[in-house]
């Protein structure tokens, strides 16, 4: 039976091997938090988390309560940290599902009932100016230290960790070092006074590679585990996702004929075109129209005409093909497939956004 539906191939072995490569860079006592928010950057949070569990990962980062519940309902073990903000009315549910929350504002604790036992990581804002207790200058440290002391005395709060997040670890070394030094000042004071705040963590994928001094007790790994290295550091990782459409139709176009909405492409000679069942509703941006190569049977093929909601068109004039062959949108560069960073560059965006844009109509298929 021929299945022509587009899909994203999720290579679990690549994911596990990527994590093992990252582990090899860390001291033995440094843990990894697998970042699986936003459906594991579009890869499928449940399958990715199960794979991480299989190789001993015990910490997971999600953005919302619902994402955490999904993992628990699929038997994911270990700590699940909600990196975003939950609603006060969700506190009881978070406790019921054994989820740890991020604390960025003391006023949130007004909604914690005396009989509750809430697990938290304290987030410190050292320069990103988003969530977290403000500590972007040395003269803020006393206030944050005293806040932590008070939290330690709060009977229904269990501090499981303390962390910060770098604003530009992949590109701004000086600012990252500034953030690291601020956070380290606080951590040193906590340690000198023998205050247990659980796991200390600061590094994302980029800073894990570029700033080993900031590994602390744990590193938070997202993009790198999915096979994308946006730094200059050398590490062997492979893409986990390949996005594939299907050649659903072919036709001959005469010189002078136009293709697609807006007539943005006019054939200069007779060409053979292929219709592929992916469009901007599936996350293949219109901005790639007439501006990118995809891969058909190991050969680069140009996207021509404007990408529409449900289909796109490629020039297959000089290709060997048959109907219902797969067309790779992005995947493994070693297989001559377009890498996702090239797609992101053409869109003037980041790989994260490209991953997260791949829609629900593109079914995820796990391979090993």
Predicted regions located by residue number:
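Active-site-proximal beta-alpha core segment in soluble small-molecule metabolic enzymes
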Residues: 2, 6-9, 16, 30-201
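Active-site anion/phosphate-binding pocket segments in diverse small-molecule metabolic enzymes
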Residues: 2-11, 16, 67, 86-88, ...
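Short secondary-structure boundary/capping segments within folded domains
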Residues: 24-26, 41, 265
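A broad structural signal for alpha-helix termini and local helix breaks/kinks
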Residues: 26, 75-76, 358
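Glycine-rich phosphate/diphosphate-binding loops that line cofactor/substrate pockets in enzymes
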Residues: 19-30
């Amino acid at each position: 039976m021929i299945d022509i539906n587009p899909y994203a191939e999720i290579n679990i072995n690549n994911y596990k091997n990527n994590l093992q490569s990252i582990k090899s860079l860390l001291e033995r006592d440094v843990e990894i938090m697998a970042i699986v928010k936003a459906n594991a950057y579009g890869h499928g949070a449940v399958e990715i988390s199960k794979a991480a569990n299989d190789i001993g990962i015990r910490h997971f980062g999600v953005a919302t309560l619902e994402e955490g519940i999904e993992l628990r309902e699929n038997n994911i073990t270990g700590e699940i940290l909600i990196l975003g903000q939950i609603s006060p009315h969700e506190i009881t549910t978070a406790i019921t599902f054994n989820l740890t929350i991020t604390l960025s504002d003391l006023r949130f604790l007004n909604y914690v009932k005396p009989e509750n036992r809430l697990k938290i990581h304290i987030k410190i804002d050292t320069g990103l100016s988003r969530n977290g207790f403000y500590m972007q200058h040395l003269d803020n440290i006393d206030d944050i230290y005293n806040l932590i002391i008070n939290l330690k005395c709060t009977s229904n709060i269990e501090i499981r960790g303390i962390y910060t997040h770098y604003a530009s670890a992949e590109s701004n070394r000086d600012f990252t070092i500034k953030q690291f030094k601020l956070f380290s000042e606080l951590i040193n004071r906590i340690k000198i006074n023998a205050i247990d705040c659980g796991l200390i963590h600061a590094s994302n994928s980029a800073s894990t590679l570029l700033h080993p001094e900031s590994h602390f007790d744990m590193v938070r790994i997202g993009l790198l585990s999915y096979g994308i290295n946006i730094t200059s550091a050398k590490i062997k990782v492979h893409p986990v996702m390949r996005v594939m459409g299907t050649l659903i139709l072919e036709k001959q176009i005469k010189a002078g004929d136009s293709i697609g909405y807006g007539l943005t492409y006019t054939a200069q000679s007779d060409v053979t075109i292929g219709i592929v069942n992916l469009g901007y509703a599936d996350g293949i941006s219109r901005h790639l129209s007439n501006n990118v190569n995809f891969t058909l049977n190991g050969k680069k093929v140009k996207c021509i005409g404007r990408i529409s909601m449900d289909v796109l068109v490629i020039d297959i004039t000089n290709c060997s093909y048959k109907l219902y062959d797969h067309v790779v949108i992005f995947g493994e560069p070693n297989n001559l497939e377009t890498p996702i960073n090239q797609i992101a560059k053409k869109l003037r965006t980041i790989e994260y956004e490209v991953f997260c844009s791949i829609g629900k109509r593109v079914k995820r298929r796990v391979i090993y």
